[in-house]
């Protein structure tokens, strides 16, 4: 059996944290359900039978999620994410209303919380047995005498679903609040108003000019391949990711699955004029002629979401002359809120930049969630 709580949760409980009948405070139970709704992108269904539904989720920690996660034994990159198990049941003794469930939530196989909550779900647009969930109207309830052990559950280990953001990008115009944004990478923005990612995407026809097998079309990723130094470093190697889609703390994702990829000297040293050190042939998808250096503009100060490639990059030729950009080959696209949340919840860099919303989730239409 699993330990029911850790000493770090003392402030979460009404009364003593060691009491067998302890319950979350009203403030804590509301914080928990808001965190599970807003800071977790997707639930993976592990088991479903007439008695119980079991879901698993993985997300980079936010301040809300961190309140409920136990202290990590080691400060590794996986210690920055929460591994969550959710058990939904409908005990007759609780006389629950329709769509109400008794819910046990475990964090990192160590801390467990009990509540009654209204649950609404809808299929997630990527993969099978994946769901987006909204948790509402929570009520704290005492822990049951028999607490399930997540380690005893048969967790699927196959990684059978991958995210290619190009498949979910739709043509867009700069939003009305185009200045209300933060820069995630060159040509990639988080819209604070829409809670969604916008980015400049290369036309699919230009893939023919890229290295064999290349799929990524985001501007930041292309610039990274063009400008990153050959010997590489941790920033170049696309580390520090988890995999919320497959509910695993370690990710084997490729750059096209996350839009954080960018020239490493821009990210870690804030350099804006960079020498071409990577795949020099990629200049053909960005500029009308060969370039020796690339200047990144309009990124850190007064950023705005723009559809114009020339607002973001300047090519400099071998004699110091400016090289025109291939503006026709790039279009502004947007990801919907669910896909944007999935990317952010799996990336340590983006989670730090994109603050989780503090507002309670309201479905855009009554039929959005079942």
UniProtKB/Swiss-Prot annotation:
It comes from the Viruses. It is found in: Virion tegument; Host cytoplasm; Host nucleus. The keyword Ribosomal protein does not apply. GO terms for cellular component: host cell cytoplasm; host cell nucleus; viral tegument. Pfam families: Herpes_UL16 (PF03044). The keyword Phosphoprotein does not apply. Keywords: Host cytoplasm, Host nucleus, Late protein, Virion, Virion tegument. InterPro entries: Herpes_UL16/UL94 (IPR004286). Interacts with cytoplasmic envelopment protein 3 and with the capsid. Plays a critical role in cytoplasmic virus egress. Participates in the final step of tegumentation and envelope acquisition within the host cytoplasm by directly interacting with the capsid. Upon virion binding to target cell, a signaling cascade is triggered to disrupt the interaction with the capsid, thereby preparing capsid uncoating. Belongs to the herpesviridae cytoplasmic envelopment protein 2 family. This is Cytoplasmic envelopment protein 2.
């Amino acid at each position: 059996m699993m330990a029911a709580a850790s000493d770090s949760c003392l402030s979460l409980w009404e009364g003593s944290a060691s009491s067998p009948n302890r319950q979350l405070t009203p403030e804590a139970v509301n914080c928990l359900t808001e965190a599970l709704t807003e800071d977790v992108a997707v639930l993976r269904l592990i088991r479903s039978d007439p008695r119980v539904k079991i879901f698993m989720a993985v997300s980079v920690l936010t301040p809300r999620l961190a309140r409920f996660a136990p202290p990590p034994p080691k400060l590794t990159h996986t210690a920055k994410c929460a591994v969550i198990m959710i058990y939904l049941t409908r005990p007759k003794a609780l006389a629950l209303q329709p769509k109400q469930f008794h819910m046990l939530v475990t964090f990192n196989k160590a801390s467990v919380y009990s509540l009654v909550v209204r649950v609404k779900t809808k299929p997630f647009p990527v993969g099978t047995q994946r769901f987006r969930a909204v948790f509402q109207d929570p009520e704290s309830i005492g822990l049951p005498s028999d607490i399930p052990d997540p380690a005893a559950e048969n967790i699927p280990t196959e990684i059978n679903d991958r995210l290619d953001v190009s498949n979910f990008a739709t043509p867009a115009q700069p939003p009305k609040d185009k200045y209300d944004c933060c820069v995630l990478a060159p040509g990639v923005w988080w819209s604070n108003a829409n809670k969604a990612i916008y980015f400049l995407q290369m036309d699919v026809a230009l893939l023919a000019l890229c290295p064999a097998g290349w799929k990524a079309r985001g501007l930041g990723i292309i610039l990274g391949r063009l400008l990153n130094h050959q010997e590489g470093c941790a920033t170049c190697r696309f580390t520090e990711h988890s995999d919320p889609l497959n509910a695993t703390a370690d990710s084997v994702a490729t750059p096209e699955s996350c839009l954080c990829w960018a020239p490493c000297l821009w990210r870690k040293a804030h350099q804006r004029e960079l020498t071409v050190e990577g795949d020099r042939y990629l200049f053909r998808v960005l500029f009308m002629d060969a370039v020796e250096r690339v200047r990144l503009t309009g990124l850190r100060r007064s950023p705005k979401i723009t559809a114009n490639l020339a607002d973001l990059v300047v090519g400099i030729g071998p004699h110091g002359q400016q090289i025109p950009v291939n503006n026709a080959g790039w279009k502004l696209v947007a990801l919907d809120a669910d896909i944007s949340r999935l990317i952010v919840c799996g990336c340590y860099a983006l989670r730090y930049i994109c603050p989780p919303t503090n507002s309670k989730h309201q479905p855009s239409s009554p039929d959005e969630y079942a």
